[in-house]
């Protein structure tokens, strides 16, 4: 049985939240990146609010597209963080890297109830490495910056990736509200 969000003590702790922010993008007339469907972002808001309402410091891990281990500017999570800020009605900090100095400083700067988005996890080739030791190396860097892990990216829970499987093995963890909801719906299906 997977632990539930309500089972975790998160007050004053850094919660590393794996979300599914792989949203469709386009460009507007000025060439700026726009999100054409924000449903995946909106679907994580209840979990984020549940955490911030309980005094957690939320650092979000997510991917966008398939950058294949390289930094691809058009696949940055900055537009996603901006939309999330609008939905939450509060500022959302954005790290300039996946797990380096900017991520560490951004997480360290959070106060209780604040939210940050780390840069696209797939900018780091270790995220999707076939070698579990390589994935664990990346997950260990994240784990050093957090206290607990919450999996709320239902669209990625089946993936064998550093921010999904290896990170959960390193920290106390639970399913987010979206994953709980989807698991419940699946339990109602009789095949």
Q: What is the predicted function of each stretch?
A:
Residues 1-189:
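Active-site loop-to-helix "anion-binding N-cap" substructures in soluble metabolic enzymes
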């Amino acid at each position: 049985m997977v632990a539930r969000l309500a089972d975790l003590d998160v007050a004053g702790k850094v919660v590393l939240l794996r979300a599914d922010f792989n949203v469709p993008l386009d460009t507007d007339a000025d060439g700026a990146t726009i999100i054409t469907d924000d449903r995946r972002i909106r679907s994580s808001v209840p979990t984020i609010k549940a955490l911030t309402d309980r005094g957690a410091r939320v650092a979000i891990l997510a991917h966008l597209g398939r950058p294949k281990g390289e930094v691809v500017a058009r696949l940055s999570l900055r537009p996603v963080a901006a939309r999330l800020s609008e939905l939450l009605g509060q500022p959302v900090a954005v790290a300039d890297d996946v797990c380096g100095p900017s991520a560490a400083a951004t997480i360290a700067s959070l106060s209780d109830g604040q939210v940050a988005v780390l840069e696209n996890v797939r900018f780091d080739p270790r995220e999707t490495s076939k070698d579990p030791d390589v994935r664990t190396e990346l997950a260990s860097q994240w784990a050093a910056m957090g206290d607990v892990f919450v999996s709320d990216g239902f669209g990625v829970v089946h993936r064998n990736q550093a921010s999904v499987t290896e990170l959960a093995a390193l920290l106390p963890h639970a399913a987010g509200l979206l994953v709980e909801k989807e698991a419940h719906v699946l339990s109602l299906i009789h095949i």
